[in-house]
Swiss-Prot record:
Gene3D superfamilies tied to this protein: Alanine racemase (3.20.20.10), Lyase, Ornithine Decarboxylase, Chain A, domain 1 (2.40.37.10)
Protein name: Antizyme inhibitor 1
Subcellular location: Nucleus
Gene name tied to this protein: AZIN1
Disulfide bonds: none
Length: 448
């Protein structure tokens, strides 16, 4: 089966009982070793279905609007559309992608904090009326270019103000909300609700307590000014673990009952992104170069072996100018799995992992302990479904990794039993036999 670099015409392999994702990865490693050793993804769409079931079981009162920029692969968007999620879009292209799947405009919100006028006009043209806004200038742009806009006022949380760099730029203060509401009234812009965002890195449950209290204050302010608000967006920040989802629900559920009880007419939504897709994708990369260095060249405080032992720098065929782009703005906590078999008592060496660009920024893992690897060996990175699918840089002729989609028969049956269908997606399934033999050159050669 070919992997789809432009996966608009993707196919999905249905795994027979006895075939697991590890078998599939083994086989593609074998194929890619023979044909060019390019990096590749394997996506398990069944995990997305499971995440949605988990969401419905834990926080059924909150409608998810999937954050498209997190992973806009057509297969991902199509399965989420079939599951009935909404979509949070940051650009014209993202809005167009989900509308091509037949998603109605009322299930799309335009969440970019800094909107281009042409894209506001596009949203107005296609009927995407729900937008977010956190300042007067954006409010005036919306008033001039989107006559049917319904705005969610984006408020800052203590988490944002406290200094997470990626978030502190966005969200207005509670103190400024009355001014913005009065401006909206003068501009005849309809304010329909409030949005806030708590990052996944935040460990303080009190941030949700304060954010929901602030949101209630803004609802009350809006009522005094003459707005009737009916939507609360609690943002993203969901990591994907059931434990974290239950923890958040434990905090917010009683507060929602107090501030926005059932029957109040307020619809509660959220913007999960990595929650749905992170664990669904695995990335396989190849070692293309290797250097032996002195152990003391590694910074103090990182995991190291004895100073008299060698250390290794490994260069991979994917990096921050490709699938690891998010490493430029956040830490990567994933330590890869070595694909080749090695003995349990094989010595481990201090190692660092780098992308292929030779740029000092292209360091993927600063330090980890690995057995000695050779050029041509493979490393497997789990949880690579979020923020990994950007267009690669043209530098050094980087190639976008192929994507191979899979789903177990049990997950497929679960979809059918739940009444989840998509005509176009159903055409893309093909059967994967359980007898994958890595010794055969043509193994797993079924075409979509």
């Amino acid at each position: 089966m070919k992997g789809f670099i432009d996966d608009a015409n993707y196919s999905v392999g249905l795994l027979d009982e006895g075939t697991n994702l590890g078998n599939v990865i083994d086989n593609y490693v074998y194929e890619h070793t023979l044909t060019g050793k390019n990096a590749f993804f394997v996506g398990d769409l069944g995990k997305i279905v499971k995440k949605h079931s988990q969401w419905q079981n834990v926080v059924a009162q909150i409608k998810p609007f999937y954050t498209v920029k997190c992973n806009s692969a057509p297969a991902v968007l199509e399965i989420l559309a079939a599951l009935g999620t909404g979509f949070a879009c940051s650009s014209k292209n993202e809005m167009a992608l989900v509308q091509e799947l037949g998603v109605p405009p009322e299930n799309i919100i335009y969440i970019s904090p800094c909107k281009q006028v042409s894209q506001i006009k596009y949203a107005a043209k296609v009927g995407v009326n729900i937008l977010t806004c956190d300042n007067e200038i954006e409010l005036k742009k919306i008033a001039r270019n989107h006559p049917n806009a319904k705005v969610l006022l984006h408020i800052a949380t203590e988490d944002n103000i406290g200094g997470e760099e990626g978030n502190m730029k966005f969200g207005t203060t509670l103190k400024n909300c009355r001014h913005l509401l009065e401006c909206a009234k003068e501009l005849d812009v309809q304010i329909i609700g409030v949005k806030f965002h708590v990052s996944s890195a935040c460990k303080e449950s009190q941030v949700y307590v304060h954010a929901l209290s602030d949101a209630r204050c803004v609802f009350d302010m809006a009522g005094e000014i003459g707005f009737t608000m009916n939507m609360l967006d609690i943002g993203g920040g969901f990591t994907g673990t059931e434990f974290q989802l239950e923890e958040v629900n434990h905090v917010i559920s009683p507060l929602l009952d107090i501030y926005f009880p059932e029957g109040s007419g307020v619809k509660i939504i959220s913007e999960p992104g990595s929650y749905y897709v992170s664990s669904a994708f695995t990335l396989a990369v190849n070692i293309i170069a290797k250097k032996v260095v002195e152990n003391d060249k590694f910074p103090s405080g990182v995991e190291k072996t004895g100073s008299d032992e060698p250390a290794f720098m490994y260069y991979m065929n994917d990096g921050v100018y490709g699938s690891f782009a998010s490493k430029l703005s956040e830490d990567l906590n994933t330590i890869p799995e070595v694909h080749k078999k090695y003995k349990e008592d094989e010595p481990l060496f201090t190692s660092s992992l780098w992308g292929p660009s030779c740029d000092e920024l292209d360091q993927i893992v600063e330090s980890c302990l690995l057995p000695e690897l050779n050029v041509g060996d493979w490393l497997i990175f789990d949880n690579m479904g979020a923020d990994s699918f950007h267009e690669p840089s043209a530098f050094n002729d980087f190639q976008r990794p192929a994507i191979y989609y899979m789903m177990s028969f049990s997950d497929w049956y679960e979809m059918q039993d739940a009444g989840i269908t998509s005509d176009s997606m159903m055409k893309n399934f093909f059967f994967v036999p359980s007898c994958i033999q890595l010794s055969q050159e043509d193994s797993f050669s079924a075409e979509a």
